[in-house]
Amino acid sequence: MQSQTLLADTPLQSPYVEKQDFRDAMARLGSAVNIITTDGPAGRAGFTASAVCSVTDTPPTLLVCLNRSASVYSVFKQNQTLCVNTLAAEHESLSNLFGGKTPMELRFSAARWSTLATGSPILHGAVVSFDCQIGQIVSVGTHDIFFCQALALTRNDDSHGLAYFDRRYHSLLKQ
């Protein structure tokens, strides 16, 4: 483990760590793999994300981070709804489709989908899907943080999970 200690009288050259050092460190932060979907007046869209987490259970709220320069950004912002589909181990190839430049029609044609309360696509076989309404948007740096209230959910308790760690996929086996 590397560490660095700065003494109080040590002048800082920059208030932040280097961008690549930060990215390399974040690659060591394992997380679930999710496909975030929406459908509504602005159209249907989806992308792969690991920047998702629980905020509170009262009301049930998650956060999803999305780069404002992403091609799908305006669709999500205008629709104001989304579904967080947490992927099962067998969804690795689907994650790659939704994480690249594949046209939306091809992304969605690669799996089976349904809908719940908001009309956002729910992935069949996902470990869990949170069907949400976007309640608040906060901008930080290059990204917007969508705070999303869960209106409905589905669970698949028999699935193995899919995680991303050290820039690779890993299956999480249910015990």
Swiss-Prot record:
Its EC number is 1.5.1.42. InterPro entries: Flavin_Rdtase-like_dom, NADH-dep_flavin_reductase, RutF, Split_barrel_FMN-bd. The keyword Calcium does not apply. It catalyses: FMNH2 + NAD(+) = FMN + NADH + 2 H(+). One of its GO terms (biological process) is nitrogen utilization. SMART domains: Flavin_Reduct. Keywords: Flavoprotein, FMN, NAD, Oxidoreductase. Catalyzes the reduction of FMN to FMNH2 which is used to reduce pyrimidine by RutA via the Rut pathway. HAMAP family: RutF. This is FMN reductase (NADH) RutF.
